[in-house]
Amino acid sequence: MGANTLRRSLVALFAAAISFGAITHAQAETLRIGYQKYGTLVLLKSSGALEKRLAEQGVKVQWTEFPAGPQLLEGLNVGSIDFGTTGETPPVFAQAAGADLLYVAFEPPAPLSEAILLPKDSPIKTVAELKGKKVALNKGSNVHYLLVRALEEAGLSISDITPVYLPPADARAAFERGSVDAWVIWDPFQAAAEQQLQARTLRDGQGLVSNHQFYLAARPFAEKHPEVVVALVDEIRKTGEWTRANVDEVTAQVAPLLGLSPEITRAAVERQSYGAQLITPEVASAQQKIADTFSDLKLIPKRLSIAEVIWRQPDKVAQAQ
């Protein structure tokens, strides 16, 4: 074998080795998704559609459940997940804390799927009567903003009440014991409290907040794997469309997963919104208003720019779809 022939053979062999290594790495790639007790991601997880779609790209899927949005985004911040869903407020607090996240997509408004609840025998009739009362909520969650806006509407501020910051399970226990006067919560915990405890709705989000669900990604993952992000959002959208058209089937499928009755599950399903899409300028502007509100209240340490953390789909990925 001549020197040139040997050189060409070695180059070809080296190229093949690199190619094989890249393929092996791609096959070992794992998309780590954080989800909560209820939502479109729960349905997507149970369907297996995402695993099937991403298998074509050599990507595996790993799912991790979190009790609420703030905890989920802490997982994203420390690198234990790549993608997840929360309400409007958690990403504001996470960004203020330095989390390297990107807003990827959102669901349409669902203002009825969060509310300020009262015990069935509570004498409280208006939000103004919460002055001086103990109100349970998950700090930095979507209902934190609902509470702020509801208090503003009633001429009060967060300093006029005693917030009791608890995750959903602990907040429900405190609510049942009578340790708090009100509980601000989202579905399916909201529907469960209404039907199991006969909790009364003092104020929901209608006419007050949008209550968008956001899908967020760790910036390094989204920038390295835009094609995975696009495929994921597409599967979320398809799952939402199917859910909207098949409420009975979804209820039967999800109730056992949640450990809730069909009646409670159906109430939550019907109040949820469906139709995931990439972030629009209008939604980014609304989210900026929320961030400014928490900054003005000194609940976050600095002003934020939401525009700086919006994921932009690369043209090459869009053209490939």
Predicted regions and their residues:
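Conserved C-terminal helix/tail region of periplasmic/extracytoplasmic solute-binding proteins
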Residues: D292-Q321
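Secondary-structure end/capping motifs
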Residues: K224-L299
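Small-molecule pocket liners
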Residues: T40-L41, A110-I116, A199-R200, N211-Y215, ...
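Short, glycine-/small- and polar/acidic-enriched structural segments
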Residues: E29-S157, V164-Y165, D181-I185, G207-V209
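Twin-arginine (Tat) signal peptide motif
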Residues: G2-V11
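Short, solvent-exposed loop/beta-turn-alpha elements that line the ligand-binding surface or hinge
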Residues: E51-G58, A276-V283, I306
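Pocket-lining segment of extracytoplasmic ligand-binding domains
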Residues: T89-P90, P163-V164, P168-P256
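C-terminal segment of classical bacterial N-terminal signal peptides
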Residues: A17-A26
